[in-house]
Each structure stands twice: as structure tokens, then as C-alpha cells.
């Protein structure tokens, strides 16, 4: 399997997974034009679309792509049914695409019906997890989002996290505002800054490394707990997550 990314809008990535024959699955096509261009250039043969949630920048290109490739199966949670999904999927479902098995996990938080798709090592997590951060809580609760992130955190170390947005630099700046002396975060900041100066993408990322720099995956970390305790004593990791998310919302 080969992983490809297509830039879209200002900071979106549309992921395309292809096999050796050129058959492919397209993840969260927010717009059709760049996808159609890439398909023509690479002579890909689209078989399916994966949708993680209903937001327009993830589903806006579905109907046009179906006009060009009506044979495609469009998988998505119930909230995407009116966005072009032809096969509804949910927590615990498994589907076989390109000869590979993908497992679905419900990840409410960013939206209530959000899901991610996992076929080792590939994780297509939509707007649940970003490198150095996580999605805003437009519909769900902090508790829901925390539990969703813990599902990701329980995956194998070598999981390849395919986030949907290039938010890494801003997220790491936030992390440094909380833990300015953290060696892992500082090293990652230098690396990410250099990549972005060159206009190179910072994704995908490996989960083992992400655990070191993403505060939202480090709510049990003693340094972070000590920093939060300077402002308020929070005993539960979910409460510490909510504190972090609130700080990020106003950063």
C-alpha cells in the first residue's frame, strides 16, 4: 500500500491510499478538483471514499467525484448520509477495501458521529487528533473527546497518524506556552518550523513520537500535572484534558 496526500483549501490534506495496481481509496475529499487532477496524473482507479465526519471541508467533493466515478462505495458515519455516504459505518465495524481490512472506531468530540478508520499502520483520524493538538469540540463534550483520544493512544507505537489539517506549528507553539522547557517539544518545534519554512508538510506522524509532544495525550505526565496545579488542582485526566482544551481555545 502507498500513502499519498493532496493539499486542499488552505490547510487540509486529502489522503489517498493506493495499491500496486493503482486502485485507491480517498479519505475526506473536501473538494473534488485537486483529487480529479491527481487521479488523472497518476492514473489511479478510485474504489472507495472514507468519510470521518460531516463538515463541509471533508465531504464537499463527494458528489462531484461520484459523478465521475459512480462505481465508488462511500463509507461514512450516519451524520454523512446526506453528504453522499452510500454505506453507513460505526463503532466496531470492519470493512474490506483494496484487499485490506479497516476497523472503524467511534470518536465523538469534534462532532458527535465522528469516526476513524484503522488498518495497521494507517490511521485516518479526521479532526480528532492533530499533530501536537486535537480537534475543537463543536458538538461533543470534553469527556467524549478525551475517551476518543485514548482510543488512538491505545493503538500500536508504529501507527501512522494521517491527520486532516496542517496545524502542527500552531499546536506546538501552544504546547510550548504550557511546557516551555520540555526537550521533546522544543526539538519538535525546531523540526516543524524548518519544514514549514520550506513549505513542506509535517504529516503523517508516528504515534510513538506523537505521545512525546502532544499534551492532549500526556494528561498523566507529571510535568504537565505540576504545571496545571499552579493554577488549579485537577485529580482526573479528563479534567486536565478539559483544562488544556479550554486554554487552547483562547490561545
UniProtKB/Swiss-Prot annotation:
Zn(2+) 2 binds at residues 57-58, 127, 165. CDD domains: hydroxyacylglutathione_hydrolase_MBL-fold. Keywords: Hydrolase, Metal-binding, Zinc. Pathway: Secondary metabolite metabolism; methylglyoxal degradation; (R)-lactate from methylglyoxal: step 2/2. Its EC number is 3.1.2.6. Its cofactor is Zn(2+). Binds 2 Zn(2+) ions per subunit. SUPFAM superfamilies: Metallo-hydrolase/oxidoreductase. It catalyses: an S-(2-hydroxyacyl)glutathione + H2O = a 2-hydroxy carboxylate + glutathione + H(+). Signal peptide: none annotated. GO terms for biological process: methylglyoxal catabolic process to D-lactate via S-lactoyl-glutathione. Gene3D superfamilies: Ribonuclease Z/Hydroxyacylglutathione hydrolase-like (3.60.15.10). InterPro entries: Clx_II_MBL, Glyoxalase_II_hydrolase, HAGH_C, Hydroxyacylglutathione_Hdrlase, Metallo-B-lactamas, RibonucZ/Hydroxyglut_hydro. It is an enzyme of class 3 (hydrolase). Zn(2+) 1 binds at residues 53, 55, 110, 127. It comes from the Bacteria. GO terms for molecular function: hydroxyacylglutathione hydrolase activity; metal ion binding. Monomer. HAMAP family: Glyoxalase_2 (MF_01374). Belongs to the metallo-beta-lactamase superfamily. Glyoxalase II family. Thiolesterase that catalyzes the hydrolysis of S-D-lactoyl-glutathione to form glutathione and D-lactic acid. This is Hydroxyacylglutathione hydrolase. It comes from Salmonella paratyphi C (strain RKS4594). The lineage of its organism: Bacteria, Pseudomonadati, Pseudomonadota, Gammaproteobacteria, Enterobacterales.
Amino acid at each position: 500500500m502507498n500513502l499519498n496526500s493532496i493539499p486542499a483549501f488552505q490547510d487540509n490534506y486529502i489522503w489517498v491510499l493506493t495499491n500496486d495496481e493503482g486502485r485507491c481509496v480517498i479519505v475526506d475529499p473536501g473538494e473534488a478538483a485537486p483529487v480529479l487532477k491527481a487521479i488523472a496524473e497518476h492514473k489511479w482507479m478510485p474504489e472507495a471514499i472514507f468519510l470521518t465526519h460531516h463538515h463541509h471541508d471533508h465531504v464537499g467533493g463527494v458528489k462531484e467525484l461520484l459523478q465521475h466515478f459512480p462505481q465508488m462505495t462511500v463509507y461514512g458515519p450516519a451524520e454523512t448520509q446526506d453528504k453522499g455516504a452510500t454505506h453507513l459505518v460505526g463503532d466496531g465495524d470492519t470493512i474490506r477495501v483494496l484487499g485490506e481490512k479497516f476497523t472503524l472506531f467511534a470518536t465523538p468530540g469534534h462532532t458527535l458521529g465522528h469516526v476513524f478508520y484503522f488498518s495497521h499502520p494507517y490511521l485516518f483520524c479526521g479532526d480528532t487528533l492533530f499533530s501536537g493538538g486535537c480537534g475543537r469540540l463543536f458538538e461533543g463534550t470534553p469527556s467524549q473527546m478525551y475517551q476518543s483520544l485514548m482510543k488512538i493512544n491505545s493503538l500500536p507505537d508504529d501507527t501512522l497518524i494521517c491527520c486532516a489539517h496542517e496545524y502542527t506549528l500552531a499546536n506546538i507553539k501552544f504546547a510550548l506556552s504550557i511546557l516551555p522547557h520540555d526537550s521533546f517539544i522544543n526539538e519538535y518545534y525546531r523540526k516543524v518550523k524548518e519544514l514549514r519554512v520550506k513549505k513542506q508538510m509535517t504529516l503523517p506522524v508516528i504515534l510513538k513520537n506523537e505521545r512525546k509532544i502532544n499534551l492532549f495525550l500526556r494528561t498523566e505526565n507529571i510535568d504537565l500535572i505540576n504545571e496545571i496545579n499552579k493554577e488549579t488542582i485537577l485529580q482526573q485526566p479528563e479534567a486536565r484534558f478539559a483544562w488544556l482544551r479550554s486554554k487552547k481555545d483562547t490561545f
